[in-house]
Amino acid sequence: MADSAGATEPIHIMGAGLSGLAAATILAKAGKDVHVHDVRADSGARFDGDFQALENWSMDADFFQQLEQWGFDASQFRATEFQVVDLIHPDDVITQPKSDRIAYRIVERGTAEHTIDQGMKR
């Protein structure tokens, strides 16, 4: 919001997870004054080295290419690419659909330097 003199108030984002960090980065690149707040001391602190799959099959664009377009450096964090997905059906049958491109990536979450949380924070 702008006051009567045209100055804008800072934008406060609650949560330093991936969505909060992405929103803050995009707003800051647009010239906004952004403050990110989180209940924990650091981005990714709730995960402590957990792994997360980031799916990549539901859109035509590659998610890491989108990150690059948004101004993130995907080389800042480790990711392992997979083209096969193991699907376990209710009857315990396992199928393995394959993709010609990257179906998903496993990333590490947390406070270590190589995690996606810290890469996006930088």
Predicted regions and their residues:
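N-terminal Rossmann-like FAD-binding beta1-loop-alpha1 element of flavoenzymes
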Residues: 2-36
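Carbohydrate-recognition beta-sandwich/jelly-roll modules
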Residues: 18, 42-43
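N-terminal FAD cofactor-binding segment of flavoenzymes
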Residues: 26, 30, 43-90
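Conserved N-terminal helical subregion
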Residues: 81, 86-122
